[in-house]
Amino acid sequence: MSYKRGTCLGFIMLLMVSHHHTKGKPLSSLQNLSRLLEDNFERSFGSDEADQQLVPTDSLDQLDPELQWNKNRLEQGDSPHVNEMTLQQLLNDPVGTSRRYRQRNKKGYSRGCFGVKLDRIGAFSGLGC
């Protein structure tokens, strides 16, 4: 009995000692954290230099006319008219949207090998799957 108790206590002490040696130093200040971030990302997070290096978006639009076209297209796509139209289509055809999901089962679509529902193997092409 004492042998088991001694082994258990020895194992616990070994765990405590190994845990004490493997712990790292805690980062206690914000400076240590910011230094760690700067080392990892090679950029200073607290400086204004990063803001000055950014190119304004207006100059990009002047350089490339396709960027201007994409920006205009995205702005037009976010109009409420498009969203209302999509909502209206969904409300007008609730049966059509649910019809797609009726034919599904747990394993997916109930279709054969090539997208056609088969009654038996090889009925469509004579070759099977």
Curated annotation (Swiss-Prot):
PROSITE patterns for the chain: NATRIURETIC_PEPTIDE
First-listed, main subcellular location of the protein, grouped into a coarse class: secreted
Keyword presence, Nucleotide-binding: no
Gene Ontology terms for molecular function: hormone activity
InterPro entries: C_natriurtcpep, Natr_peptide, Natr_peptide_CS
Signal peptide from the UniProt entry: 1-24
PANTHER family: C-TYPE NATRIURETIC PEPTIDE, C-TYPE NATRIURETIC PEPTIDE 3-LIKE PRECURSOR
Name of the protein in its database record: C-type natriuretic peptide 1
Annotated source species: Aquarana catesbeiana (American bullfrog)
